[in-house]
UniProtKB/Swiss-Prot annotation:
CDD domains documented for this protein: PseudoU_synth_EcTruB, PUA_TruB_bacterial
Family classification: Belongs to the pseudouridine synthase TruB family. Type 1 subfamily.
Enzyme Commission code: 5.4.99.25
Keyword Protease: no
Active site: D54 (nucleophile)
InterPro entries attached to this UniProt entry: PsdUridine_synth_cat_dom_sf (IPR020103), PsdUridine_synth_N (IPR002501), PUA-like_sf (IPR015947), PUA_sf (IPR036974), tRNA_psdUridine_synth_TruB (IPR014780), tRNA_sdUridine_synth_fam1_C (IPR015240), TruB_C (IPR032819)
GO biological processes: mRNA pseudouridine synthesis; tRNA pseudouridine synthesis
Pfam name, any one: TruB_C_2
Organismal lineage: Bacteria, Pseudomonadati, Pseudomonadota, Betaproteobacteria, Burkholderiales
Name of the protein: tRNA pseudouridine synthase B
Length: 315
């Protein structure tokens, strides 16, 4: 009897890979499945994602590898920007195009009414999380209750819509429009679409969603899983942005060898030991480098006249 594994190529070992992959996630793939596939393609020893993106959404999914995982929480907290396609005239059972249409109504609004409605959602608002979401109630994801035909009480949550703009409007020819939304973490765009529909008096549901930015990271330079797979194995790690791509809001500080040694031991660096001209406000963050070429050592915070290490990296 032939061993079916005999003809398989040997599995290559994991390797140390550091950086952030700006992945353009395809439709229908969960964030976790995208992470598993990217980790396998890169043969990475350590990886983590920076917050989920619905399977029915496409677009930017930053994936952190190696030492970059130490900063993944920062992206979880960051604002997100989406392009959302909305259809007016009916709600749906899931809030998106996958659900059964409910409460079909006539659409009598025009572009001006849509623009006015959108403006009303800028700022801090309250949202009731949708039943078809991963948010947990009594230890179970809400979508499990929804699949069982149950509706449970959900507390409203406060989120912030930083900006919202009408990109395209098919009215009056077709009852649909596309908006660009920048919002705080935890915002449900499908719920926003439904609430806009109610404000317009005709109901609405989401028909498409694409994330175009997470904090300062954008789709510019993002790659697909197919593009990674097409690269030679040895070239794939070069598709990652460096760890400090996550730290661009931090002030760069270059230390000399002596100060760098103390910094890596967790010691604070006094202002007098920083490069001449270094100006850091109290409580501000710095990304710290040393050597030639410069190597990232970590992140520090300025407190009481000294730079204090907060997170060190080993690159």
């Amino acid at each position: 009897m032939t061993d079916s594994n005999a003809n398989r190529p040997p599995r290559l070992p994991r390797r140390e890979v550091h950086g952030v992959l700006l992945l353009d996630k395809p439709l229908g793939l969960s964030s976790n499945d995208a992470l598993v596939r990217a980790k396998r393609l890169l043969r990475a020893a350590k990886a983590g994602h920076t917050g989920t993106l619905d399977p029915l959404a496409t677009g930017l999914l930053p994936l952190c590898f190696g030492e970059a995982t130490k900063f993944s929480q920062d992206l979880l907290e960051a604002d997100k920007t989406y392009d959302a396609e909305v259809r007016l005239g009916a709600r749906s059972s899931t809030g998106d195009a996958e659900g059964e249409l409910l409460d079909v109504r006539a659409v009598t609004c025009d572009r001006a009414a849509v623009e006015q409605a959108l403006e009303g959602f800028i700022g801090e608002i309250e949202q009731v999380p949708p039943m078809h979401s991963a948010l947990k109630k009594d230890g179970r994801p809400l979508y499990e209750y929804a699949r069982a035909g149950q509706t449970v009480e959900r507390a409203a949550r406060r989120v912030t819509i930083r900006s919202i703009a009408l990109l395209e409007c098919a009215l009056p020819g077709a009852p649909s429009f596309t908006m660009r939304v920048t919002c705080s973490k935890g915002t449900y765009i499908r719920t926003l679409a439904e609430d806009i529909g109610e404000a317009l008096g005709c109901g609405a549901h989401l028909t498409g969603l694409r994330r175009i930015a997470v904090g300062d990271l954008t789709l510019d330079g993002a790659v697909t899983l197919a593009q990674i797979e097409a690269q030679d194995d040895a070239q794939r790690p070069a598709m990652l942005a460096p760890v400090d791509a996550l730290l661009q809001k931090c002030v760069p500080v270059q230390l000399d060898a002596a100060a760098a040694g103390r910094f890596l031991q967790g010691q604070r660096i006094a202002q007098r030991d920083l490069p001449v001209g270094t100006a850091l406000a109290e409580n501000s963050l710095a990304r710290v480098y040393a050597g030639e070429p410069s190597r990232l050592l970590g992140v520090a915070r300025m407190r009481e006249g000294a730079l204090r290490p907060e997170r060190l990296v080993k690159l």
